């Protein structure tokens, strides 16, 4: 009875209560309708939280560990107004989305927030909360995620992106798989 009265009052006041009553606001990445996943990328049960059709774009050869969460928009909550409570049902989530480059590894239990772009070759340490863009060929970690180290020099990172091995055909990649164990300098010199 209390729930009926509560819903009646919320309707009378013009408050959208549907989001409060929902039990599930997420989908598994594999089931998400607004995702684009590149060749050979995989996940182990990543979850997408969304309240809009903001896209998730994942490049080729990405490894996404178990319990990774993608929060693709702000869920109608504002941080720069008097209250963050979503009073009006006509509030629209700011569509931000998430963009992940190629050859990215996202560690166990990490959370990637809306508006973030993760560069090619980046590594996200387990348990990180990524709130800002991640440069190519860097390792970030923590809450919020911060630079831990660069995997190679900035010049080498640019050259690796020019080589773009992830765009080679599968047969070419398979024939060169042992070269992936080379140092960045040796690999760049070879290709």
PLM regions: where:
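Residues that scaffold the ATP/ADP-binding catalytic core of kinase and kinase-like folds
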Residues: 73, 81, 133, 148-150, ...
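Membrane-proximal basic amphipathic "stem/tether" segments
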Residues: 1-29
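Short conserved catalytic/interaction loops centered on acidic-Pro-aromatic/His motifs
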Residues: 119, 131-141, 150
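Conserved G/P- and acidic residue-centered "switch" motifs that form tight phosphate/ATP-binding loops
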Residues: 124, 142
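Beta-rich strand-turn-strand
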Residues: 108-122, 128-132
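Flexible, glycine/small-residue-enriched loop-and-beta-strand segment within the central core
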Residues: 25, 36, 42-116, 143-144
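C-terminal segments of enzyme domains that contribute to small-molecule binding surfaces
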Residues: 8, 32, 87-112, 144-191
């Amino acid at each position: 009875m209390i729930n009926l009265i509560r819903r009646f009052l919320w309707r009378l006041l013009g408050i959208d209560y549907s989001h409060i009553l929902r039990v599930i606001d997420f989908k598994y990445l594999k089931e998400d309708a607004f995702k684009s996943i590149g060749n050979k990328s995989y996940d182990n049960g990543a979850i997408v939280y969304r309240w809009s059709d903001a896209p998730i774009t994942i490049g080729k050869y990405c490894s996404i560990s178990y319990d990774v969460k993608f929060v693709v928009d702000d869920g109608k909550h504002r941080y720069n107004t008097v209250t963050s409570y979503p009073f009006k049902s006509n509030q629209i989530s700011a569509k931000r989305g998430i963009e992940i480059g190629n050859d990215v590894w996202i560690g166990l239990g990490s959370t990637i927030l809306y508006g973030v772009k993760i560069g090619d070759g980046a590594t996200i340490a387990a348990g990180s909360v990524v709130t800002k863009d991640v440069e190519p060929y860097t390792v970030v970690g923590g809450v919020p995620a911060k630079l831990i180290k660069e995997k190679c020099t900035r010049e080498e990172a640019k050259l690796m992106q020019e080589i773009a091995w992830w765009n080679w055909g599968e047969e070419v990649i398979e024939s060169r798989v042992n070269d992936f164990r080379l140092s960045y300098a040796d690999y760049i010199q070879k290709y």
